[in-house]
Amino acid sequence: SALVEILGSVGTVEQLISHPAGSVVTLCANRPSAEWYFADGFTGADSIEQIVLTNPFSDATVVDISFVTSETERTPANLQGFVIPPQSVITLSMDEQGARNEPVLAVSVRASSGMLIAGRSQHYLGQGRLGYSMSLGASALSTQWSFPDGEKVDGNSEQLVIYNPTKIDRSLSVVFINGSDSANSLEPAVVTAPAGRVTLLNTANIPGLPAGYYGIVISTNDLVDEGGVVVEQVVNRRIGNSVGTSVLLGAPTGAASTVWSAPSGVSAGLADSLVVLNATPVEGFVTVSQVGPAGTVALSGLESIPVPASGVVVVAVPAGLPQSEIVIQSTVQVVVQRLLSRGNDLVGRAAVLALPHLPSPDVGK
């Protein structure tokens, strides 16, 4: 792990990982938390899942770790009151904690003393998943999660993994957003997420879901308390006998913004470099710019791209663009996701959100 401190100003940081099973970009935490959650986990076909626990402080952090499989919730005795020494990193291989060959594996990390940062490293080796991913956990539950890049495409499979670590069953609405008028829009799917369990929603089973791209917004219907759930999206993109798996933690409540940054840039030349979700009832306009020696300059042809109300737009970033920070500005609050090349001529995409500027700035049309 690395700690980056920016003195006298503000900045954006993310991590680029090169792996033989696929390169990925992962967001960095801007603060520690006393709790971390991972909805999706997978050790099927001897796939490797590791939870990475970082304590950047000069005092020890004490945590309780539990996990949920398709059959039960487990709280291993050796992971209760687990001590993370000061200024240290500990990696837990989930197969060594009694979770080998599990197709469903959600993890909770709760600190009883101190705070920490928790991430997840995944190397998928079979049972429909191949590739590598690295991501932060969710540092809090949320009553809403948004995903810009829903895909119903030949060869792809898409699954929403919902983890409810609370003691109360949750009723959820799953809304699919594709810019259709009210006459053609889909009714929200209603899903019950039982307390302490993982719920899987295969979007291929949603009746009437049209082919193509759509956004997804998952919200809790009950107002019992301020708790919520954690939701991740798993997409397997298949070409022939090859598969590329991506896992994305959604954007939580309050993450929509008019300005988003991608510090490490995008994969230029892809037809689906960026996907922008506009969940508002108002049409917006998006401009994609690059940061360089001359400052922030709009990319030719990517000025004022219309984004339909309650819709998504897929943006192709031109080939030949040098790798540097990209800034996405919108006249309405949006959620922005990047789809990145996995490198090594591997099929599929790596998926990661851009970074929202919060509170959301005012951006003129």
Spans of features found by a protein language model:
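Beta-strand-rich extracellular modules
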Residues: 7, 110-114, 219-223, 331-333
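Short acidic, flexible loop segments centered on an aromatic residue
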Residues: 53-75, 111, 159-182, 273-296
